[in-house]
Amino acid sequence: MNVEEEIQKLEEEIHRLGSLQSDGSYKVTFGVLFNDDRCANIFEALVGTLRAAKKRKIVAFPGELLLQGVHDKVEITLRPPPPPPQAVAATS
């Protein structure tokens, strides 16, 4: 699995485990993700996938590195998808 596929899987898992927010984002704590059996089977390096997703501005969390135990209560936010582009009205 390449990085893009792992990020897509990460998004799916955050949707599954997280809570939908009023702005369309999803929130989940690092501990919930890290300790989930399904996530453990999918991601060889969850922290690396999270960092790659953060770099692409798909997720947000404080700091650069999350560690098991120490950061279990840190919230990870899956940002809402961008709105579809507005259709340009044809002028006559």
Swiss-Prot record:
Residues spanning the signal sequence: none
GO biological process: regulation of actin filament-based process
Keywords: Acetylation
Modified residues (N-acetylmethionine): M1
InterPro entries: Costars (IPR044302), Costars_dom (IPR027817), Costars_sf (IPR038095)
Family: Belongs to the costars family.
Name of this chain's protein: Costars family protein ST45-2
Record organism: Eutrema halophilum (Salt cress)
